[in-house]
Amino acid sequence: MARTKSSRGFLGALFGRKKKAPARKKTSLLRKVTYMLIALFTGGGSIAGASEYDWIRTVWNLLRERIHAPTAAPSGTSGVDGDTGAIRVYFTHPENPPEQAGDIAHAVVGYIDATEQTLDVAAFELDNRIITDALVRAVRRGVRVRCVTETNYIDESGIKALRSVGVTVIDDKRDGALMHNKFMVFDHKAVWTGSMNFTENCAYRNNNNGVYIPDAHLAENYATKFAWMFEQHKFGAAPNKTDRIPNPLLTLADGTQVENYFSTHDHPANHIVNTLKLAKKSIHFLAFSFTHEGISTAMLDKHAAGVEVSGVFEKTQTAAGHSAFFKMRDARLPVFLDGNPRNMHHKVIIIDSEILIVGSFNFSDSADKSNDENLLIIYNRGVCAKFEEEFQKVLKIAREANP
């Protein structure tokens, strides 16, 4: 695209040496410019062979550095493990007995009980008793509840309970690929997502995370993906090549910048690799399954460049010998097998204590190319601090189990 006089003026206005706008206007400017770029160019094709949103993402990062660097969200008190501005963070506590470790499940129940009109549930599995009971209560008080699930778990107790009260449940009916999401959309206003399946094991025995984000634009993304699965029975890819998730780049009410991608159409692994390239000081990760060559290579490259790279792997997922654990161990990175007698189920990367990668997305080719998955990249020091605490806790247990 030729650079016209008007386009030079536009770029100059963005990146030229001008007096800084007042702080309260920075987020608004970033949002307006980003949305304008998306509106102008996502209608068709790609630029210089770039994958789906890569070129937009490049502009996003330039704008972020120029206009609005990551800032810590203010601390709050209403989240169980951490209320960091617009994002509430939760973790499981498998070191405690179930009757003392149910905070994350009770949090989900609280959000379900507060739902007034619509509730869309994408559940890889559903057998957690109190979450199921809350969903049934929602149906009985008139909330429209819809559900998509993985075919392999269509007969779980929670799915049967929903069907018994008239909820329509759609399963993916695919062999060799999974509907692996674990998210809920509340009243088209807020989203719950993370690594935790809505099960007894995941809530009480496995290491997991969940985030609650009240944002209508993010909810629109998840509602769009849900509709593709529930209404069009389209799992994995988008229904059509022209279909898009509406808000891949967004800014929350507290200024937190978020990227949001889904498998397979958004190629989340590419976005993970590109984000890893931003690392200057540290990369900390917790990985249930980690076999993706591109992601592991990006981490090893950063290690070679002097960035501290450290992580914990779920031990049962290394048995086949294909895990990135062995390559990293051979390169003498401080990586460990987890110490939970059950499963360490996180899928988390923390970069420079500023950027968090989180969601249902395991670091594997299947997650990127076959499954239905969701991924968030969150630029917020406060949220990263909460996940860093969890990383250090899991790392300590792993070190003690593997002296």
PLM segments and residue spans:
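Active-site microenvironments of hydrolase-like enzyme catalytic domains
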Residues: 180
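Charged, low-complexity intrinsically disordered terminal segments
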Residues: 2-171, 177, 185-403
